[in-house]
């Protein structure tokens, strides 16, 4: 029997679960209809150029019978912008709402789903800050209506990082690299760049970690910058509104936030549910996406609610939630775990359960603050990105070959090695029209040769890569070495040094909002421990 199977990343919806989802959707429709929002529906399939701002790897691409390039929509705001541009008469103050599915490419064999349902509002033509307040009120009212008890509001702004960096005399490359390091919470790179900036302000010394209480503390000191003060005044208005109308909802700020969507231009508002480790809603101001016939831009504010998050909250047993859920640390078994254990202990993490692991793979600390899971190196990122783990510790060689849906926070300076290009001593690449390169790391090798401007044939090996040149399978290899001894024993020599390898400290994106105090404390301690001695902070 030729059984028909689901495509990877997809799922069927059925029975009681689907009925619950339909009830949620109908409630949203009824509420927004009653509030006077106008429904709008756009096609699942759009012209490719509607999503020019999206990264290629995130979008499903299609071709029609004429060869026209199409995509499955990964977003619902951009199709609405396309609709409004085609119907110029609607570009007055207009309140629209939508309910539909969006599609995203996922990492192969990751276990993720590529389709989710969103309900959202778009407030078009409203320049005043009342649009932000209305959008926040709409989302918080839904959270209250659906009984989501632990939502917290996280405020950020698309302009903030650029406005602060403008205060320094930086060339474009340093400015762009600094912004990227801040948004990606890459503290190792941030520290390197910060050292190049004289008189860097103390209140931003830990800028990638400037969220939650750390962000609020830095926020107070940054109000001396007039443009920043205006942003923070708006945040205060939103916080005061929330506290007045929803006193049980916490409000915090993120001074290091990456843009949820590339078209945002101002205030960004997100609703995070710590116990689920996921966002309930997200949105912001986008004042340059729409324009009238005379090219005058049209202000707009939009917010999207994740229907699956509402459903997940409804289906769980709230009485089983524990305020003491441990932080889950996923460790690569073997040398990585052994080398990093003393460092974690010095940072205040109880690692005693790892001292005599026997055959166990899961360990809880006595105080229930941490849970350790030991896995193979290649599986660390999967556990992290699927929400099983909060922290991942693994070598950068493994990270380099996998998709990144987490923060690569810190180089722990353990497990040091390097990637090298090696071959037999008579290797003469200039005499070979197209090199054959054997490696366990095709992604890294491909990038290396791309940067060199060379076209090569890569051969993926799982075992002893050194055999490639010896047997004639390959002309050279890209592999890891610590001492170079294995290369020498196999009569190979190093022709180029490709990059460094070390153990890295990764954090799941939602974990920093779930456990802000504990994780930022540990991260800061680790920063001090791995810093050169003369740079160690008091």
PLM regions with names:
Residues 60-66, 170-189:
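Acidic, His- and aromatic-enriched active-site or binding-groove loops in soluble protein domains
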Residues 17-31, 46-47, 79-89, 98-146, ...:
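Positively charged, Gly/Ser-enriched RNA/tRNA-binding surfaces
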Residues 321-538:
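Domain-level signature for soluble enzymes in the chorismate/prephenate branch of the shikimate pathway
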